[in-house]
UniProtKB/Swiss-Prot annotation:
NCBIfam families: PRK08560.1, tyrS. Homodimer. This is Tyrosine--tRNA ligase. GO terms for cellular component: cytoplasm. It comes from Natronomonas pharaonis (strain ATCC 35678 / DSM 2160 / CIP 103997 / JCM 8858 / NBRC 14720 / NCIMB 2260 / Gabara). It comes from the Archaea.
Length: 345
């Protein structure tokens, strides 16, 4: 692949890229630029994480050196979402789940490297750099940067503010040319682009994934079980959630069913050279087969494809994609119980 093709692969199925020309320059100057994504091991991973993880398959194919940070300290700093005693089990669970998602997306999990926050964030050089960032950042700037990521209140904990600066610093500490994350991470990585050059580091290029709508419409909520599909949900649960999902005929706005198809199912099926089939009785026009998401959306908007026909096909396809990850996680019930005792014990 040439530089343009590699950049196209990095940029596809994303919400925003800052800046495309910077990524092209990286490919022109380096054989294997570096990229990283960080996840704080808090709640169970779900299909929203899967769409973000699937993108790493594109990064690997484009020839990026990819690191996944399991940010264990961050998981406690953000309003103690993960108690200290659960950090080890949840970190192991996240690594296992991410490996499963990468494999299910058609890439080799050996193409990514894992690192935990405690592997480097307690070292003296990192700590000194963090103190320098703390000295240079106002309270309001830190709050603004992390407003979409950490819990906010009128009287925030210091942990939530340190969290934001640590995430910005992680880019430099991991020597990442590209910072990747959901679009909710934008504020933090703009802070990194703004401040890291003042401390002797290069500013990172940034790639942002879209945040999916919940199945009930609006933003996906980690606390609302029916708004998302967990990686351990079985086929029956997936069918039930998709069957009850917000998916009004002809409407694409805040339609989680369509978004799951666009950002997860079709990219995975494309990797497998598989088409998406909607089964319909002959009296309603017979089966429909789609090679691209755009074709499906056009039929949905025009009314050719009805939600009653789309939903069963979507549920079956999502189950097919999630199944190998589900099987991998359920093979180790002790890990699930250790990481999330309130659900699996």
């Amino acid at each position: 692949m040439d530089t343009v093709e590699r950049t196209d692969l990095v940029a596809r199925f994303t919400e925003e890229v800052i800046e495309r020309d910077e990524i092209e320059t990286l490919f022109e100057e380096q054989d294997e630029p570096t990229a990283y994504i960080g996840y704080a091991p808090t709640g169970e991973m779900h299909i929203g994480h899967f769409t973000t993880m699937r993108k790493l398959a594109d990064f690997i194919d484009a020839g990026l050196d990819v690191t996944v940070l399991v940010a264990d300290l961050h998981a406690h700093l953000d309003d103690a979402k993960s108690p200290f005693e659960l950090l080890e089990a949840r970190s192991e669970y996240y690594e296992r789940a991410i490996e499963g998602m990468i494999a299910a997306a058609g890439a080799d999990p050996d193409g990514i490297s894992f690192i935990r926050g405690t592997d480097f964030q307690l070292d003296e050089p990192y700590t000194l750099d963090l103190y320098r960032l703390l000295a240079d950042t106002t309270l309001s700037r830190a709050q603004r940067a992390g407003s979409e990521v950490v819990r906010q209140s009128e009287n925030p904990s210091l942990g939530s503010l340190v969290y934001t600066l640590m995430q910005a610093l992680d880019v430099a500490a991991l020597d990442a040319d590209i910072a990747y994350g959901g679009i909710d991470q934008r504020g933090i990585y703009m802070l990194a682009r703004e401040q890291l050059p003042d401390h002797g580091y290069d500013k990172p290029a940034c790639v942002f994934a879209p945040l999916l709508s919940g199945l009930s419409g609006g933003k996906m909520s980690a606390s609302e079980a029916g708004s998302k599909i967990n990686l351990t949900d079985d086929g029956e649960a997936i069918d039930e959630k998709i069957g009850g999902a917000y998916c009004p005929a002809g409407e694409t706005e805040e339609n989680g069913v369509l978004e799951y198809l666009e950002y997860l199912v079709f990219p995975v099926f494309d990797q497998r050279d598989t088409s998406f089939v909607v089964e319909r009785p002959e009296k309603y026009g017979g089966d429909l087969e789609y090679g691209t998401y755009d074709e499906l959306e056009a039929d949905f908007v025009s009314g050719e494809l009805h939600p009653a026909d789309l939903k069963p096909a979507a549920a079956a396809a999502i189950d097919e994609v999630v199944a190998p990850v589900r099987e991998l996680l359920l093979e180790d019930p002790e890990l699930l119980a250790s990481a999330y005792p309130e659900r699996y014990e």
